[in-house]
Every structure is written in C-alpha cells, then in structure tokens.
C-alpha cells in the first residue's frame, strides 16, 4: 500500500506541475482584467503587420506567442455576441459560457514563423486574412476594474470557424 500511495502522490505532483505550466502559458498580465487582456490580444491590432502587432502581446508575456487571431471588429460588437445563446465551449467541454457570432467578421490570424527565445523583438509572424465566425467565452465583468457599461464581457477567444 505504501509504494502505491507514494507513487500516486508523485503522479499527482507531476500532474499539478504540468497544469501549472499549461496555466502559465494562458495567464494574463496582472495589471489587466480578463476583458482588458482579451481586447489587447484580439481586438487592438496595433499594426497592419502581424510581426509588429504581436510585439505588444509578446512584450507583456515575455515570450513569442505561437499564434493569435485579431478580430477586425470593435470590443462593443464582441460584447454584443455575449448576448447570443450560451453554448458549450469547443475547447473546454466543461465550460458553458461560450457564444457564437451571428455573422462572419474579417480577421487576421498570426502564426509564428521565426521564433526568437533570446530576443522576443525578433519573433516573426506570417499572417492570414479571412472572414469567419468566432466563438467567445464571456463572464461577468470585474466589478472593481472593468467599466460598468458592459455587465458581461468577452474573456477568451475560444475558436474561429
């Protein structure tokens, strides 16, 4: 019994460690709410070129993000999608707070082509424009830090379809 207990504790620690690593890859910078971070990552494309636009995100995360999608719409329009019927999130079947856009939007998908772990300013990206539907996860706003005009806000771009 003791070896099994010891082995299971090691497995549990390994699993928790892996979850911590995965969680840290999706972590937001502390100074932002989830809605603010969503807007930075998926709405505010600061340049027409992915390589330049991704520098903003990469500087916050201190790493080259593998891929990212910028929706060419407004934050208010995405907030309106939060009012569409709830659905199960495709990327996490235990979450039921996803909503699909009712129409396609122009978007730009950025894909890392030149990793640069030593200097994130040198990360290079290819970009693919498209018109697609999207699915977002929405939650109640952060009462202390998000503006009160939107009680429910997008917090995660779950899928583009």
Swiss-Prot record:
Residues 1-27 form the signal peptide. One of its GO terms (cellular component) is lysosome. PROSITE patterns: RNASE_PANCREATIC. One of its GO terms (molecular function) is lyase activity. It catalyses: an [RNA] containing cytidine + H2O = an [RNA]-3'-cytidine-3'-phosphate + a 5'-hydroxy-ribonucleotide-3'-[RNA]; an [RNA] containing uridine + H2O = an [RNA]-3'-uridine-3'-phosphate + a 5'-hydroxy-ribonucleotide-3'-[RNA]. GO terms for biological process: chemotaxis; defense response to virus; innate immune response in mucosa. The active site is at residues 42, 156. It is found in: Lysosome; Cytoplasmic granule. The keyword Signal applies. Its EC number is 4.6.1.18. Glycans are attached at residues 34, 44, 86, 92, 111, 119. The modification 3'-nitrotyrosine is found at residue 60. Disulfide bonds join 50-110, 64-123, 82-138, 89-98. CDD domains: RNase_A_canonical (cd06265). Pfam families: RnaseA. Substrate binds at residues 65-69. Keywords: Disulfide bond, Endonuclease, Glycoprotein, Hydrolase, Lyase, Lysosome, Nitration, Nuclease, Signal. Belongs to the pancreatic ribonuclease family. Interacts with and forms a tight 1:1 complex with RNH1. Dimerization of two such complexes may occur. This is a non-secretory ribonuclease. It is a pyrimidine specific nuclease with a slight preference for U. Cytotoxin and helminthotoxin. Possesses a wide variety of biological activities. This is Non-secretory ribonuclease. It comes from Nomascus leucogenys (Northern white-cheeked gibbon). The gene is RNASE2.
């Amino acid at each position: 019994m003791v070896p099994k207990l010891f082995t299971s504790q090691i497995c549990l620690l390994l699993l928790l460690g892996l979850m911590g690593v995965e969680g840290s890859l999706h972590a937001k910078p502390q100074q932002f709410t989830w809605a603010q971070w969503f807007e930075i990552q998926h709405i505010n494309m600061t340049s027409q070129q992915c390589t330049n636009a991704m520098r903003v995100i990469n500087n916050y995360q201190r790493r080259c993000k593998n891929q990212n999608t910028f929706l060419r719409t407004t934050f208010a329009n995405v907030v309106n999608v939060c009012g569409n019927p709830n659905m199960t999130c495709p990327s996490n079947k235990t979450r039921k707070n996803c909503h699909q856009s009712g129409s396609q939007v122009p978007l730009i998908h950025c894909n890392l082509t030149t990793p640069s772990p030593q200097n994130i300013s040198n990360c290079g990206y290819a970009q693919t424009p498209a018109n697609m539907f999207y699915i977002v996860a929405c939650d109640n706003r952060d009462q202390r830090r998000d503006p009160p005009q939107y009680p429910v806000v997008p917090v995660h771009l779950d899928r583009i379809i």
